[in-house]
Amino acid sequence: MNMQLERITQLSILFAVSCFGIVTNTNADMGKEGSHEALELAEDIGRWLAGNAIQNDNGTVWPDNALSPDTIGYDLASGVAGKVVYFVALYRATGNVEYLKMAEGGADYLIGVLQDPSSFEQNPRRASLYTGISGIGVALLHVQRHASDQKYGRAVNQIVNQLGEWSVEDGGGLRWSDEFNDLIYGDAGTALFLSYVAQQTADEEALDLATQGARFLLGQAQESATGSFWYFRRSKPFNLPNFSHGTAGVAYVLATIGTIADDESLRSGAREGFTYIRSISEIEGGLLRIPYGWGADSWAGLYEFGWAHGLSGTASFFARLQISGIDAEAAAEFVSLSRNTLLNINLPGTPAAPFAEPSMALDKRFGRAGVLSLLSQWSVNEPVSEEVVKLRDSILAHIQNAAIRQNRMAHWVVDAPEFMGGGRAAYTGIFHGAAGIGLAVLRLHASINGASPYDTLPDDPFAWPEETKNDVGLKEN
């Protein structure tokens, strides 16, 4: 284990032990009833996804929306890559090789996508983590850990090489996007993926690309009297400070890569981002609010609790800082504030003002599944408070009550917001659909059983310490 990885692991243990205060229960005390209930729902989701799978010449695909089966994406957010990650997680939870075979079928299709440049060349976000080929790489790495065929690892090498070819020297570093800084669409996500590959495979080329991408992002910082922030888009002054499109996500990437590469300038950039987040935070009565953003009238006075624009995601940034030893004491305070707030804003019901009901109530990106995932991870293999268990179980029940369950299958039908096209939808993916809800439920199952997370997404600070062991060996193939 390299020194940087060892440091992250040691700090993560301290983080888990120190963050959560007085405890009155442990996961072992919860019994196996909740574990069985969670796994049953996760497998019902898997059966529904399997029932919507389509076999083609290259492998297995799923429609992004089961009610509109003609739209099939390859990406991590909504497409095939996300379902591949889910079936690998389900395999890890159950040991059922049929789930791994389903994941391999999806991974075979993704390899075919990489062989056909027309699949992604016209995508302006082609390099990105959630909407480009970096997300394909995440899915392939999940499969390669368990597959005997090394072709998935070779395809990851191909992605790293392609990202190297696409990179553009700019501002003392490298970029891939002409427009986006952020985690979902932009250079932050691409650089994070490359660091993820480096951690799992000891790929020095990937780490060099990641580090240079982080240095470009460092140059995109907007200085203020209280720290630095990053715009979502370079051509428009949209300041969305939370995780998915702004400062928390970009600074998360700087903290991650800075720690892996032992680059103090990147760690300092993450610290400046944290200083800015602290400066805009509103703390009252032990509750934390972080504004949605600035740049559109509709964002004024808006606060959310979800992964994308609220506390569930930005708490991951605070956790990454603490794990990485960057302003660890202050970061611990903000982890605690985030936790206390989520426990006291009336979830899983209508959130207490000024927190708003998000555009998608249940999903992993905006809604309650993101909170469930975070709460579950906070209690992995550690003592856990009654309050966390109560909210965790209440969110699971809320999600179950909204599900359509027939013939041992489960899915959700929702009214899609206008920015997603409107109408009724039964989404299948990680961001808005069954796979994302399923991953949150599997996080709960893992936490009850004291297990490591079954999935290891790059933007999850909790999964990295135990799961990245430089043992995939892709460069040997």
Where are these regions (language model features)?
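Bacterial N-terminal signal peptides that target proteins for export
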Residues: 2-12
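Intrinsically disordered/low-complexity terminal segments and short unstructured peptides
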Residues: 8, 23-25
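Bacterial N-terminal signal peptides
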Residues: 11-21
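Glycan-recognition and catalytic cores of secretory/periplasmic carbohydrate-active enzymes
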Residues: 28-477
